[in-house]
């Protein structure tokens, strides 16, 4: 993972704003995700079994890449104080052990009255999209005394 915790208030956001972070997937990350999610599908955990699948080897859980989106939303854009309320996802390609996943979120709409911010979410490996979708968050408002 790269990047320090940042963040912005609703009033500081504009359509087109974006943030990105990179995450390198290790076998330990997949094993830990399997432990916390209870998703122990052998395609993620058993190399011999995974070799018999169309993927021809272990792959990361799709939701691990989705968790990386959550990290960017919660740490950077909008950042701390935001609430993740929805996400659509399309998994385009597998993510493998050793891959570096570059996650970018971009503001596509802002509803000031409700503080709802809609963002496009894209995860890429070597410039190829592995996952994309759209997220909605409630962004924190600036303090009245600021």
Q: What is each PLM-predicted segment?
A:
Residues 1-17, 95-146:
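HotDog/MaoC-like acyl-thioester-processing domains
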Residues 2-60:
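Catalytic strand-loop segment that frames the active site of acyl-thioester-processing enzymes
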Residues 22-24, 90, 136-138:
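Generic structural detector for well-ordered beta-strands
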Residues 35-39, 74-78, 125:
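Short, intrinsically disordered, mixed-charge
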Residues 51-60, 64-104:
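Hydrophobic beta-strand-centered segment that forms part of the acyl-chain substrate-binding groove
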């Amino acid at each position: 993972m790269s990047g320090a915790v940042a963040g912005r208030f609703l009033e500081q956001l504009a359509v087109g704003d974006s943030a990105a972070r990179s995450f390198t997937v290790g076998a330990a990350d997949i094993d830990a995700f399997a432990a916390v999610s209870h998703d122990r599908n052998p395609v993620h955990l058993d190399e011999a079994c995974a070799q018999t699948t169309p993927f021809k080897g272990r792959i990361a859980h799709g939701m691990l890449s989705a968790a990386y989106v959550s990290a960017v939303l919660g740490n950077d854009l909008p950042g701390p104080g935001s609430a993740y309320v929805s996400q659509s996802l399309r998994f385009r390609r597998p993510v493998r052990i050793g891959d570096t996943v570059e996650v970018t979120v971009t503001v596509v709409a802002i509803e000031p009255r409700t503080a709802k911010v809609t963002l496009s979410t894209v995860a890429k490996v070597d410039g190829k999209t592995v996952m994309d979708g759209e997220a909605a968050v409630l962004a924190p408002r600036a303090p009245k005394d600021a």
